[in-house]
Structure formats: C-alpha cells, structure tokens
C-alpha cells in the first residue's frame, strides 16, 4: 500500500515489526490480547528518523562530471576465438576515477547462445568486492545445443569490435542494420559506476524499462531510474519493480529486437535523440540481445529465458473486491452480501491490513475478527465457490521482551532462531520500520522451512486462497536501523496520521452539480485517529554523508554518483532499507535491493505449495524483477482516482507484458483520493478486460464498490457479463501466455508491427488477437476516438454489440458512440472466440453450456482455440485443446487431450456471412438457425452435444 500506509512495524531486517494501534498480538502460538482498537497512550516513531540526507541527482547537477567526456576507455587485447564466440582482456587506457575506482583489467566473453540470442559479458579480472548475480537467484540464459560447436552462419546476430579504444556493435545479419553500437563512446567500469552508450536511429521507438507510470514509448529525454521504490505511483518516477529490458522497434527495416541487462544493480537509463546511455552503480555487464524479428518474437524470446509466467488458477479471472478499511468481519460479510444483493458477480474478497492484530503479519484481531466468526465467514465463502485473499506485508514484528504476551509472537522467534534477519554491518539486527515478512537473508541462505511453517500455521487458523504480497521493495519508513534498542517500546504509532480523510476528486467532478454528492458524503468513514505525542528516539549512527570515493565496495550508502530516486531527498535509504544492511552470506542490500520482492515471491510461492500441494499458488505482488512472473501476478500499485491513471493503466499493462508479467491489473476506480460515479463507471468497464480485475481504495476515501452508485452498478453488470461470457477465451490466453510468453493485453504496434502510425497507440488495446477495446478516458464525453488498423483493406472489424461489420478506414481516427455505461468493443475478423454462459461465480460459469463466436475475415476464414483443464492443478494430468478453423463455409473443431468437459455446445454465432444460407448442418444434421444482417445464429446444438461440446471432432457447414 502507499508509503502513507503506515509504519506498520518496527522492523527487523527481514521482518516486520508491526507497530501501531494496539496491544499484544493474537498470533500463531499466542493467546488473544487486548483489542487493537485500544485508546491507551502509545509511543510514536519520531518524524526526524524518516528524513534522509538531501542528494542532488547527477542528471540535475550542472557541475557533475560527464563520464562519457572524461573517461579514456579500454583497449582489447589477447582475443581468443572459442567454439561459441570469443574471449579477451580489456586493459584500462588511463584511470580517471570519476565516480569510483576504475578497474585496470576486465574480462570480455562473447557467446552466441542461440540463433536468435547473443550474450556480451564484461567483468573485472579481479572479482574481489564485486557482486556477480548468482545463477541460483536469477537464471542465466544458457547455450542451446552443443556448447562446443556452432555454425555462426545460422545466427541472426553478429558481434563486431575494435581493439583500440574498445567498442562493439551487434548487427542483424539479414539486414546488416546495426542494433547496438558503442562506437565513439568509452566504456566506464569502476567499483561504483558502470556506463556504456549505444547509438540509436533517429525517430527511434523504445519501449520497456519498467516500472514507471509513463506512456508506452520512452521518448527522447526520458530518464528511467531502475531502483525499487515504495512511492505512490508518481508519473515518470521509479516505482515498485525493476525490469532492465527494452524493445527497439524499427519501422525502416520492419524489425524489432530486445536488449536485457541481467543485473540487480541500481541503474539509470537515459534516452536521447539518437542514443541510449545505461548506467549501474555496481555489478558486472551481462547483456543479452534477442533478434526478434517481430515485437512478439522478441518478447517471447526474452520471457522464455527469464522464466515463463505462472499458470494462474481459473478462478483468478473472476472479479476481486478489496479496500483498506474493511476493518471488521461484519464489514467483510456485508460487502459480500451487497454484491449478491445487487447481482454483481464477486469471486474473491480481499483483506488489507485491517484483519491483523496490531498490524502483525500472520495474526488476526481477536475483537474485530474473532476466530470463530472469521472461520465461519470463510467456510461460507468457500461453500459458495468464492475466495479470500489477505495481505502479507514484508516484515516481522519485533515483540516487546518486557511484555510476556507480546513476546509470544512466534514468527519473530522462528526467524531469530534460524538467523534469517538482516543485520547491520556490526552484526546487530537491522531494525527499521515496516519491513518484509519474507525473510530475505533466509532466501540467500536457502532456509525456507520456517517460512513454510508460519504460512502453513496461518492457513490452519484462517484458510485463505492466496496471498497479496505488499511493501516488498523492500520498504522501511525510517532511515537506517532506527529501531535498534527501541523495540521494548513496541507497539508504536507511525509518525503521521493513519487514514486521514481524502479530499481530492477526479478532474471533471463538480460538487455543486453532483446529484450523488449527499450520498457520497454520508459514506465517508471517520476512521482517522490522532497519534500520540510521545516519541521513539532514533538510534545514533555514524554515516558518511558525502558522495565520496571509497575503495572496495565503496561508499554504498551515499555512492559518488547520485541517481534520481523518486523520494523527496533522493536518499537511497528513504522509504527503503539502508544499502549497507547485510544479508546472510554477507551480501549487502546495495547490490540486491531490486531483488527483494522477487526473492520473497519465490519463497512465498513454494510455501503456498506446502499449503496447497499440486495446486497453482495464487499471489499478487507489488515489487517485481525479471522472472517474477514465474511466481506471481502484479497490480499497478497505489494509483489515484483520476482519469490520467485510468489511461496509464494501459501502457503499464503493456510494460508488464514485455517484462513477463501478463497477469496484471490496476486498482480499478483508483486507490488514493475519492472516486466519483463517472470515473468509476468508465474504469469498472475498462478493468473488466484486464487479466486481473480488482477494485481497491484507500482507508480515508469514500466507498467505491460498484453498487455504491446505481449507474456504476449497471455499467459493471454490463461489462462483467461480457467478461464472464469470455472466460474460456481468457483462460485459453492464460495458458498461451504460460506456455509461450505472449502477453494477454497487446499493443497495436505489436499486432501491426510495420505501421509506424501505431507506435504510440496506448489508449486502446487488443485482448489476445481477437478483441479490440476502446475505453473512454476523459470526463464529460459520450464519444471516443479509436483507430482500426487495416480496416477497409485486409482487416475486418465487427461491433460486439450489434455483431455487424463496421466500415472503418485504415489510418483514420474513427469516432465511436460511447454513452456512459457503454465501452466500445470490437472483434477482429479471422478469429473464433470460445464462450460459456456466465454465472455468478467462475465455478458456476464452468457448469454452463459453451458457445462460439466466429468472426470471418475478408476471405471467409477464421481460426481460434480453446484450452481446458481442471483449472487448478499445478501439474496438469488431463487437458483438452480444441483447434477451430473456418474456410469454405465450414467450421471444423478438432479436440485433442483427455480432459472431459461435460457441458454441451449450445450455440454458434457466425459474423460476416454475406447471404442467408439455405441450411446449416451440424455434421450431417440440419439445425435451427436465424439470419439477420450478415450474421448467422445457430441454436439448439445442445441436443447434438449431450456428451460434451468437444468430446469429438465436428463440423458445422452453411
């Protein structure tokens, strides 16, 4: 949750010291304690310990040295050809020691790993004090085939170099275009600063380099800071995740390639008019080039190497409801009942930190969430085929040793006994404020059993269905080990008011003219409390505040090169653990800060496998890194209830698709601030087409469940009916993404990669290859503009609602009717979409009859597929894949696999049939149909498919 979200804990290195409102926790192995709503006097974390040291980012510092101008570079000597490439030694020409101490000698290794992949690896000859990212933490792409033999003529990529004033180029062999070139730019490689520059073509199109709130294209002038950061979704700032990969889409040659730097270092990337500059503050150079040649090819090649996305359970495609403020079991129950009352499908209800006792992980509040009522609620939820997901913040509370009941908090003792918590350089426990529940030191030391145990014990108490992993950048609300020697004052308040009332509203919201203003006002919950005036003093420590050069690892708290970190002072320790915090094997946070969330996700995923053997773990996490998609889905973080953030959710989804995190969604209707009926209506409909669909908001904001406003409820029911009808299509896309790495939401420029006019389109998107969504992203309008590539030429589009072909023109920005409650949706000709009659839950929907929507292209052809299994098994023993093809007025269905879907096929709708057929046959039997405006509606097929819609091959002819 937001960095405003509270100092939920005085933290222990890898654990959280949940601190806030109340007394001892009801935790695993502890007895119930006083209510967390207690009004007794409490200590407060002093504000001064939250303030970092003011840094001037180098990019804003006019007096900063330009490394590219000052550095002398290296010469390449001792080049040796290898079966897969070459090796050599880079010798420093002259030390300049601009932002660290230059390394005299570097090892160069070039490896042709596959026909479409090339690796360039540069590291110091002496690796003392150099962090090299271990392969067991983040997988390293390996050579395909025989490592001792390769036919270089087969490679799509060619490596060329110059010995004197070393530089290199990567060239596409088929077109001879230079994809990457450091010519004219010296390599800088020191203990705390690495820099290389590559030329780019003019009018380049660079995408990726997440995570930030930005449009699809990183235009010239963009600065991308890659440093995981707990901050509430600032536009153009570094936020939760780090993904050092970009796509370079070139329209002159109609090709796309990808470049990936495998590093966990703090990084900064500058996009110029004709160049890209990449910097890191530690580590080595480990570059991978993927040749594409299409955007989809390049994405798949990259994602395949970092790890294909997790296969999410079928139920995850249902609607999820959450908010910070469901603070009693009665409120949770009321929300679930209201969704049923208003006939709005609800699959999963979520809990934010409200359920915890004093905000301690793995606990429940015995007064607001009494265990018997809590379990009864969960039993009823599961009985109705619904699900529950609680939050798990990345921290373990440090109990007060002077309080016997408080000291019974077992998760702390588990971790302490196995020595998994972060340490200060002197070996003492690093104690911050709001830290991680998944113990990072444990990950590096391979100790997982305690994590498995606490999660399993937690599940035994309150049987959840998945985990929401938050605050795992990792976040700490104070600078340094501020809790050292102070945990005996726990629990303690944060240094700000928790849940203060939100006063902002979306652009276009007029209070005086808002017919629902009165009801909105009445729904505001006065939950803010005033914190105590007492304080917890910070621990004293000696810190080098200067960005000075230092030998060895260097000055890691304040490195000589200051990045632009989106915190008020740019201090690396602001809202984060200090860079000098030490992990189990001596690794410092400075080198692996960006990995924290990823390693938590890995451990949590495997702990969930202990809870749900051979079931697909469900997890949504905030901080991500390459390969995180193998373990988790992702949500867009603490956005704002405003139109701009509805728009930004689309390019953010594209960026996560590139990064291998296709199961993505934003907080629908907005997290921070107050939403209104118009924005929420539009956003609920937009969100219904994202893979992950959740409404969530801030404690102090007004209610924004879709049933709060009648207009939003109706709009939601309309779009949810479409989503649930298309669940088989979405599940098939989930499977495709899991097996191929393809994103689910797709940019127009990926679908039509040779049309430069589409390069920046990020206000529309494809769902798979078959659906085009054109949302309204501004207030006070009833029309929206959209483009439809190839329309009127080689492409055909059909209106979802009328099922008629729309006569658009290629390259024209078409005006679409979009009254409130209506989201324009079109089907691209040439696709077959599997459907299933929607029910209230995913489980109900899966029991209903199937259908097919066939959208013919200009040649009367179409194709598609359907994937089915039990929807939850990690290792799928039984599955069904149905291939659909249409040509010559015949639809053919060819199933393969042994999974039995008992539900019949009820109907088939065929779009784009020019003349009314004389008859329609299922196999050789005449079947009922109607014809209207180029659409054939075939019904009554259930009597021919009683044994299951896809139990055998069939044809339908017309």
UniProtKB/Swiss-Prot annotation:
Keywords: Carbohydrate metabolism, Glycoprotein, Glycosidase, Hydrolase, Polysaccharide degradation, Signal. Residues 1-22 form the signal peptide. Glycans are attached at residues 61, 78, 107, 197, 403, 416, 513, 580, 602, 813, 907. CDD domains: GH31_MGAM_SI_GAA (cd06602), GH31_N (cd14752). It catalyses: Hydrolysis of terminal (1->4)-linked alpha-D-glucose residues successively from non-reducing ends of the chains with release of beta-D-glucose. It holds the Pfam family Glyco_hydro_31_2nd. SUPFAM superfamilies: (Trans)glycosidases, Galactose mutarotase-like, Glycosyl hydrolase domain. The active site is at 470, 473, 638 (proton donor). The gene is GAM1. Gene3D superfamilies: Glycosidases, glycosyl hydrolase (family 31), Golgi alpha-mannosidase II. It comes from the Eukaryota. Its EC number is 3.2.1.3. This glucoamylase has a specificity toward both alpha-1,4 and alpha-1,6 linkages. Belongs to the glycosyl hydrolase 31 family. This is Glucoamylase 1. The keyword Glycoprotein applies. The keyword Ion transport does not apply.
């Amino acid at each position: 949750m937001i960095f405003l979200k509270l100092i939920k804990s005085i933290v222990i290195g890898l654990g959280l010291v949940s601190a806030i409102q109340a007394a001892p926790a009801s935790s695993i192995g502890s007895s119930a304690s006083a209510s967390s709503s207690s009004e007794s006097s409490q200590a407060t974390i002093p504000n001064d310990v939250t303030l970092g040291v003011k840094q001037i980012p180098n990019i804003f510092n006019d007096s900063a040295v330009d490394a590219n101008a000052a550095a002398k570079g290296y010469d390449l000597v001792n080049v040796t050809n290898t079966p897969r490439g070459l090796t050599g030694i880079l010798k420093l020409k002259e030390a300049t020691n601009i932002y660290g101490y230059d390394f005299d000698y570097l090892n160069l290794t070039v490896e042709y790993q596959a026909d479409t992949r090339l690796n360039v690896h540069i590291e110091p000859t002496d690796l003392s004090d150099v962090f090299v990212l271990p392969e067991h933490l983040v997988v390293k792409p390996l050579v395909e085939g025989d490592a001792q033999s390769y036919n270089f003529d087969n490679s799509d990529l060619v490596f060329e170099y110059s010995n004197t004033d070393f530089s290199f180029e990567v060239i596409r062999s088929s077109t001879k275009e230079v994809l990457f070139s450091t010519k004219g730019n010296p390599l800088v490689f020191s203990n705390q600063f690495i820099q290389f520059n590559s030329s780019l073509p003019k009018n380049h199109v660079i995408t990726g380099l997440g995570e930030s709130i930005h449009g699809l294209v990183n235009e010239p002038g963009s600065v991308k800071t890659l440093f995981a950061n707990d901050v509430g979704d600032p536009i153009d700032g570094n936020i939760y995740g780090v993904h050092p990969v970009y796509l370079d889409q070139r329209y002159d040659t109609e090709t796309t390639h990808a470049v990936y730097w495998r590093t966990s270092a703090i990084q900064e990337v500058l996009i110029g008019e004709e160049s890209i500059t990449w910097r890191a503050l530690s580590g080595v150079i480990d570059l991978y080039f993927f040749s594409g040649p299409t955007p989809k090819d390049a994405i798949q090649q990259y994602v395949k190497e970092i790890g294909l996305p997790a296969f999410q359970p079928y139920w995850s495609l249902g609607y999820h409801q959450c908010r910070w403020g469901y603070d009693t079991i009665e409120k949770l129950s009321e929300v679930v009942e209201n969704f049923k009352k208003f006939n709005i499908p609800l699959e999963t209800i979520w809990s934010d930190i409200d359920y915890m006792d004093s905000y301690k992980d793995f606990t429940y509040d015995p007064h607001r969430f009494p265990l018997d009522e809590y379990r009864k609620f969960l039993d009823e939820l599961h009985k109705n085929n619904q699900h529950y997901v609680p939050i798990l913040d990345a921290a373990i509370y440090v109990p007060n040793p002077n309080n016997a009941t408080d000291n019974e908090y077992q998760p702390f003792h588990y971790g302490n006994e196995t020595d998994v918590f972060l340490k200060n350089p002197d070996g003492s426990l690093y104690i911050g404020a709001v830290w991680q529940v998944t113990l990072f030191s444990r990950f590096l030391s391979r100790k997982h059993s305690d994590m498995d145990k606490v999660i399993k014990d937690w599940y035994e108490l309150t049987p959840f269905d998945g985990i929401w992993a938050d605050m795992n950048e990792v976040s700490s609300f104070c600078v340094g080990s501020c809790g050292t020697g102070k945990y005996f004052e726990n629990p303690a308040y944060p240094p700000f008011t928790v849940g203060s009332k939100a006063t902002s509203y979306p652009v276009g919201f007029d209070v005086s003219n808002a017919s629902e203003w009165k009801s909105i006002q009445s729904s505001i919950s006065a939950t803010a409390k005033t914190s105590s005036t007492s304080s917890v003093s910070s621990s004293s420590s000696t810190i080098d505040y200067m960005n000075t050069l230092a030998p060895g690892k260097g000055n890691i708290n304040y490195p000589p090169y200051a990045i632009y970190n989106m915190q008020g002072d740019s201090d690396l320790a602001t809202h984060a653990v200090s860079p000098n915090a030490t992990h189990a094997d001596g690794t410092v946070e400075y080198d692996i800060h960006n990995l924290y969330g990823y390693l938590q996700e890995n451990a949590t995923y495997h702990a969930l496998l202990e809870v749900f053997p051979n079931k697909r773990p469900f997890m949504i996490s905030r901080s991500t890194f390459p390969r995180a998609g193998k373990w988790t889905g992702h949500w867009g973080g603490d956005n704002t209830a405003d139109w701009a953030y509805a728009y930004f959710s689309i390019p953010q989804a594209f960026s996560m698709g590139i990064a291998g995190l296709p199961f993505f969604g934003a907080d629908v209707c907005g997290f921070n601030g107050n939403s209104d009926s118009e924005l929420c209506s539009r956003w609920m409909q937009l969100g219904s087409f994202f893979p992950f669909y959740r409404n969530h908001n801030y404690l102090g904001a007004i209610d924004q469940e879709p049933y709060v406003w009648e207009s939003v409820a109706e709009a939601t029911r309309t779009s949810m009916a479409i989503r649930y009808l298309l669940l088989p299509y979405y599940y098939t896309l989930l499977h495709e993404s899991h097996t191929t790495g393809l994103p689910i939401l797709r940019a127009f420029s990926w679908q039509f990669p040779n049309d430069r006019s589409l390069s920046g389109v990020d206000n529309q998107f494809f769902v798979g290859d078959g659906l085009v969504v054109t949302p309204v992203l501004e207030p006070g309008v009833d029309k929206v503009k959209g483009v439809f590539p190839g329309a009127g030429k080689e492409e055909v589009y059909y209106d979802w609602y009328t099922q008629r072909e729309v006569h658009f023109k290629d390259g024209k920005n078409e005006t679409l009717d979009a009254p409130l409650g209506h989201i324009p949706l079109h089907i691209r000709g040439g696709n077959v979409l599997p459907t299933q009659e929607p029910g209230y839950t995913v489980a109900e929907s899966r029991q209903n009859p199937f259908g097919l929507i066939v959208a013919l292209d200009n040649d009367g052809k179409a194709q598609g597929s359907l994937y089915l299994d039990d929807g939850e098994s990690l290792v799928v023993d039984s599955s069904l894949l149905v291939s659909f093809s249409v040509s010559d007025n015949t639809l053919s269905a060819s199933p393969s696999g042994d999974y039995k879907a008992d539900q019949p096929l009820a109907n088939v709708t065929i779009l784009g049939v020019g003349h009314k057929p004389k008859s329609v046959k299922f196999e050789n039997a005449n079947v009922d149909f109607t014809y209207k405006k180029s659409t054939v509606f075939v019904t009554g097929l259930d009597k021919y498919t009683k044994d299951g819609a896809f139990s055998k091959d069939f044809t339908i002819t017309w």
